[in-house]
Structure formats: C-alpha cells, structure tokens
C-alpha cells in the first residue's frame, strides 16, 4: 500500500504532549492548505493551533507555550527552523522521522487536529492534504499505521448508535481501549434514542463539511488578494 520513505524511519523517543501534537498537525496541514506562507511563523503557527474550526478540542495556547512545544519537537527532529528568513519559520519533518508516506502523514495530522474519526470522515477531512480514491484506500493506510511497531493508530470499539469504527492516533501514548468501550455502553443507557443520536451526528458532519468548504473558499480568495489567511484568524 505505502511507498518506502526516502530515509530510514526513526521513532520518537517519547509520547507527544497535546500541544506538541497540535503544533505538528498544524504544520502538516498548513503545508498543503497555505503553501505560500509555509514554513510558518510563530504567529501563524499559534493562530493555527487556536483555530475555532476543524479542531477538536479547541485550544487557547500562548506563543510561549508553542515555543516550548517547538523545542520539544526539535529534540525529536520532528520540527526544524528554516534559515532563509529573518523571521523564524518552522516546518515539520514528520514523514521521514516517523517513516511513513505522505498519505499516512496526512491521516495522522488530521487525527492530531480533530481527534478520533471514522475512515469516511478522514477521507473527507484530508481531501486538501491528500485525495484518497475511496474509503478502502484510507482503511488500507490506517491498517498499516496500526500494524507499525510501535503502532501509530488504533481502531476504537464502535460506540452505541454508530455504524462505523473510529480511529485514534497513538502519538500521545498508549490508551485504554476498554475505557472507550465502557463509554459506548454508558451512552447506550442515556435517554437519547440511537436514531436521534445518529441524526444529530449527521447534522454535525453536514455542518463540518460546510465549514470546510467555506474555509477553502476564504483561503482561495485570500490567496488571490495576496492576504495571509492566518491574519484573518483562520
């Protein structure tokens, strides 16, 4: 399924903190969505971390906290600072350090930014990073990530009222999968009927899709006008 990376894989020596994971995900995302402003300045990177859309959970981190996260990621060779600009700019080295192809890196970035998602949701949410041909393609790369040693993702137990399994990244460390199963069982005992729950989830997905299309339109218009999208609070 995947192609062999250009260099041998190198494993992170420890689990990432939540802010480190957010920083890494933002760098991978913005590399594709706003290539004209990538590598990112500290200000743009912080704005990307604090986005109110396409983020779960929403964060409110300071530039100082982002700098600490950058330093931690530098120590793992996952991020490095460019030297061709007077303003410090940062870029990721995710593909090579983790030893994964661009398709897998796109999936990991989206899991870092948006939390657990189904294969169908990942296919939709990664479209600007990589256009997967179908859901089976997404699942193929997810399976590879799950079979990696150590594993980079895990398939979660299907929650009550859900038709598909969700996937979660493990770059922040191992998780207790049984706790997710217990949470799903507890959800089944709640007063919200499965059909109503599914309707609410469908509405949420529809709203998320609309927001993504609007974001893409704003970024395109900003690019045409020569405006940095991050300056608009994207």
UniProtKB/Swiss-Prot annotation:
Protein name, per record: UPF0502 protein Reut_B4455
SUPFAM superfamilies according to UniProt: Winged helix' DNA-binding domain (SSF46785)
Entry similarity comment: Belongs to the UPF0502 family.
InterPro entries hit by this protein: DUF480, WH-like_DNA-bd_sf, WH_DNA-bd_sf
Source organism superkingdom: Bacteria
